[in-house]
Swiss-Prot record:
Name of the molecule in the record: ATPase synthesis protein 25, mitochondrial
Domain of life: Eukaryota
Taxonomic classification: Eukaryota, Fungi, Dikarya, Ascomycota, Saccharomycotina
Native source species: Yarrowia lipolytica (strain CLIB 122 / E 150) (Yeast)
Compositional bias (Polar residues): 54-64
Region (Disordered): 44-83, 265-296
Annotated GO CC locations: mitochondrial inner membrane; mitochondrion
Gene Ontology terms: biological process: mitochondrial gene expression; mRNA stabilization
Span of the transit peptide along the chain: 1-24
Biased composition (Basic and acidic residues): 44-53
Localization (cell): Mitochondrion inner membrane
Family listed: Belongs to the ATP25 family.
Length: 655
């Protein structure tokens, strides 16, 4: 339809076309169609009217153009270069004289004149208290910062601001994203080593990781001189600690607790504002049971410690100390009993006013070395910390004894770090300093020498090698006796325990591991026998030896399969002592566990009468009856022999 309306190379505008179509469609009926001839005539008439109007305006336009051309012809000729290539005209510079108002004198006079003018900054800057805390990790300080923000917001009705804290769950979401994409080496989740909280209450909270806190060293930056305050504290203030409740006991440690019963926690220690009762786990401790540290820093404060008698002792001023605290003495003693040496050493400076501070630290190290969790590799560091605290030049008798116990425990764990000779040299130094060396210390070294693996390993079968081990042990014992004035050790030899330990030094350590104080389960294995043990046994009367010492001699003979001295000693016991159930059970157990048929036949056929009492009766109980049954079954599996003894054992077993 567009071609119908083409007139002299022009096309009607869409608006005109729509208007014409609408105009002519309104006059005609829809069935008659569109009258294109009438439309064409109307368009031709409009074109003629337009041309006449243009002819009327032609003289005016020509006059305007003539004026423009005439004006341009009178002006200078148009340059051939464009405006951006033309040469710029030179800029004229004219000097300007301005009076600055400065005097004409020299600069020194000007400086002196300016020095008379004093400028004072009258802006008021309020004092800010700083709380410095440490966290175990970035997640730890993140959680602690969130808890502090919650306490300030919900309990004190303030809106604190923080830096270094991310949005809630930001770390968790980023960590999940890392796991999902498996790009842990390339992606890093939000991390922070320093969190700063403005409480809007006059103090700021800084929470660091341990490394960041040491690097920033914020304590020295905010350390100013201030008046020292004396605080009197009595043991009644810490009555909650004796009841087993764990709350904040000082400004240097938060401990978890059930209820906020500490009087110091009833009000804010910084602002003095009363706290609202709340179930927030951060109020008065960590309710989840996790132990967290939040250290406070106060400039050049005085550390106080409490004695049991109610008095308080002020510590010496230590400007280098950045974490003062108030801790009762019994808490240190409790940590020492638990073997928490790190806790005691971290607060060792707080113990300065106490005379027995070194003894407490040494006791903590001793108990630490006795813990089942302490291993071989923990000994060197513990020994190094011991000698950092222990000073032989000014040590008291309790300190010498406590340090000796620690070294003995260290020797039992790691004889390479603390050999036997080091223990002997320690006692020599103790005696040279004027401190008394008691017999239990000598006996302790003997016991440690016997039970240690420094000189022997289980299963030495060579007699020559075993004699070398015995010589080393005897040399240590001899050196101990001679070094401390016991040349004629009559007192010690009269002691049954010392005799038992000497016998143990001559006996190889076996899988039975029979001790010096308690009789262990007897298990014999064939080992070489040192003849000095036999000489010691024959030189002592049976009456001065108790059952434990006799067990050592019997076990030593059974371990070496030396049955002649074994039954010879049994005859001596039968003549000089009374037979009881313990003695019978010891002999039968050693023979049965030896798994030697020679010992079976000799005991059951010829030496069984040595186990009978004065009336000729064999002491029997269920344990002895069971072992006798095993011996008789090994010798006579068919049950034809030992009919009378079998009848007695069966009666005992089924009675």
């Amino acid at each position: 339809m567009i071609r119908v309306f083409l007139r002299q190379g022009r096309v009607l505008r869409p608006s005109t076309l729509q208007y014409r179509l609408r105009h002519f469609s309104d006059d005609k009926k829809p069935t008659q169609g569109l009258d294109f001839r009438a439309l064409n005539n109307e368009i031709g008439g409009e074109r003629q009217d337009k041309s006449s109007v243009e002819n009327d305006n032609t003289p005016v336009s020509q006059a305007i153009n003539g004026d423009i051309i005439g004006a341009s012809s009178t002006s200078s000729e148009t340059p051939s270069k464009p405006w951006y290539l033309r040469d710029q005209p030179e800029v004229k510079e004219e000097p300007v004289n301005i009076d600055l108002g400065l005097p004409d004198g020299a600069m020194n006079d000007i400086a002196k004149q300016l020095a008379r003018d004093a400028i004072y900054d009258i802006k008021y800057i309020p004092e800010q208290d700083i709380l410095i805390g440490s966290g175990k990790s970035s997640r730890h300080i993140y959680k602690a910062g969130r808890e502090v923000m919650g306490v300030l917001k919900h309990q004190h009705d303030v809106l604190p601001t923080a830096e270094g804290l991310f949005k809630k769950n930001a770390q968790r979401m980023s960590y999940r994203r890392m796991l999902k994409k498996a790009r842990k080496q390339n992606l890093e989740f939000p991390d922070s080593e320093w969190v700063v909280i403005d409480s809007q209450m006059g103090f700021h909270v800084h929470i660091f990781t341990a490394e960041k806190r040491e690097l920033v060293n914020l304590e020295d930056l905010y350390k100013f001189e201030m008046d020292e305050e004396e605080v009197e504290i009595s043991p009644e203030d810490f009555a909650w600690a004796e009841k087993g409740q764990k709350n904040v006991i000082d400004g240097d440690e938060f401990l978890s607790g059930q209820h906020n019963s500490d009087p110091f926690l009833r009000s804010d220690s910084i602002t003095g504002l009363p706290k609202k009762p709340s179930n927030n786990p951060f109020d008065g401790g960590i309710g989840s049971g996790q132990r967290r540290s939040l250290h406070t820093s106060a400039p050049a404060a005085t550390t106080l410690a409490v004695d049991f008698d109610g008095g308080s002792a002020a510590a010496k001023d230590d400007e280098s100390k950045s974490h003062p605290s108030i801790i009762p003495l019994f808490m240190y003693q409790k940590w020492a009993t638990q073997g928490d040496k790190d806790q005691v050493l971290a607060k060792y400076d707080d113990l300065q006013p106490h005379a027995n501070r070194k003894e407490i630290v040494l006791s903590a190290i001793t108990n630490f070395l006795k813990l089942p969790t302490t291993g071989f590799n923990d000994v060197p560091q513990a020994v190094e910390e011991l000698f950092e605290v222990f000073s032989p030049s000014d040590a008291s008798n309790p300190e010498w004894k406590e340090a000796f116990k620690a070294l003995v425990n260290a020797y039992a764990l790691n004889h390479k770090c603390v050999p036997t000779q080091a223990l002997v040299d320690y006692l020599v130094a103790q005696q040279a300093s004027g401190a008394a060396v008691v017999n239990w210390q000598v006996s302790e070294i003997v016991r440690a020498t016997i039970d240690s693996t420094q000189y022997e390993q289980v299963g030495v079968t060579s007699l020559k090698e075993w004699q070398r081990v015995v010589d080393a042990k005897i040399q240590i014992i001899k050196q101990l006796i001679e070094s401390f004035g016991l040349v004629a050790p009559v007192r010690l030899l009269a002691n049954d325990r010392f005799i038992r330990r000497v016998a143990r030094s001559l006996t190889q350590r076996t899988s039975a591991s029979f001790g010096l104080d308690l009789v262990a389960k007897p298990e014999t294995t064939k080992h070489p026998l040192d003849l000095r043990l036999k000489l010691l046994e024959e030189s002592l009367p049976i009456k001065m030896l108790n059952r434990k010492t006799l067990f050592v001699f019997f076990a030593a003979y059974a371990n070496s399969y030396a049955w002649n001295p074994f039954f010879k000693l049994l005859k001596r016991c039968h003549k000089e002592t009374k037979t009881d159930n313990a003695h019978v059970q010891t002999i039968i157990s050693l023979v049965l566990n030896s798994r030697d048929e020679t010992a079976y036949y000799r005991l059951m056929e010829s030496e069984l009468g040595l186990l009978c009492d004065a009336q000729g009766e064999l002491p029997l109980d269920k344990d002895i009856a069971v072992k006798l049954e095993k011996l008789m079954d090994n010798i006579d599996p068919e049950g034809r022999r030992f009919q009378q003894l079998r009848h007695k054992t069966n009666t005992q077993l089924y009675s």
